[in-house]
Regions:
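An alpha-helical, amphipathic repeat domain used for nucleic-acid recognition
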Residues: 1-208
Length: 208
């Protein structure tokens, strides 16, 4: 057998031994799963529990590792939620409503979600929505006014902002740019404007 063949065989044997040890020690397997995921990005307790379940870790071993990692500060759902809110509000302009829904899907408890989204005060949320509208309206100049309204409203709706706020900000931005003569702005209060314009993709993806 060649030197490379011996090295390959030795590596395979070591891997087999490691798998055998993990099978005998489920906590070791649980620890390995959690450390691998946490090395890539922060994770919630629920995300790690789900990963261990998929990896065949017994519930008792998974619970023991979750407690140990939480006590060591490696799992901190409150810190995860705060970082999530700050990151995705500033990078994507998501509203409290959308941020809360995302955190809930990631397994964060309601109390921790409330504390995290309260980082954003109402004025900050409105200011972010206004910047989004200004950017969208600037990028759609020259298009029919009804199209501009629909696209701006759809963009805000997908980010979780309520229609009332969306139409108020669109009205204000259009008035500021002198476009109010091109469209009856009273129509912006009508509920039949398509908020989910199919020309635009939804905001998805759940990584910090």
């Amino acid at each position: 057998m060649t030197r490379n063949g011996r090295a390959s065989g030795s590596g395979e044997a070591a891997a087999s031994e490691a798998k055998a040890r993990d099978a005998q020690d489920p906590e070791a397997r649980a620890r390995q799963i959690c450390l691998r995921l946490l090395a890539a990005a922060p994770r919630t307790r629920a995300q790690l529990a789900q990963a261990m379940h998929r990896g065949g870790v017994p519930a008792e071993a998974a619970k023991a590792i979750l407690v140990r990692f939480t006590d060591a500060g490696l799992i901190d759902d409150a810190a995860f939620a705060r970082a999530w809110v700050e990151s995705r509000h500033h990078s994507r302009g998501l509203s409290k409503r959308s941020l809360s829904a995302e955190l809930r899907r990631n397994g964060v408890e309601n109390e921790q979600i409330s504390e995290a989204v309260d980082i954003l005060d109402p004025e900050q949320e409105v200011a972010t929505a206004r910047r989004l509208v200004e950017r969208k309206m600037a990028s759609t100049r020259g298009r029919p006014p009804e199209t501009r309204v629909r696209q701006a409203a759809g963009m805000l709706a997908r980010k979780g902002y309520p229609p009332g706020l969306a139409f108020r900000l669109i009205r204000e931005v259009m008035q500021a740019e002198g476009a109010e003569a091109a469209i009856d702005l009273d129509e912006l209060n009508e509920p039949d404007v398509d908020l989910c314009d199919n020309d635009h993709t939804r905001d998805v993806g759940y990584s910090l």
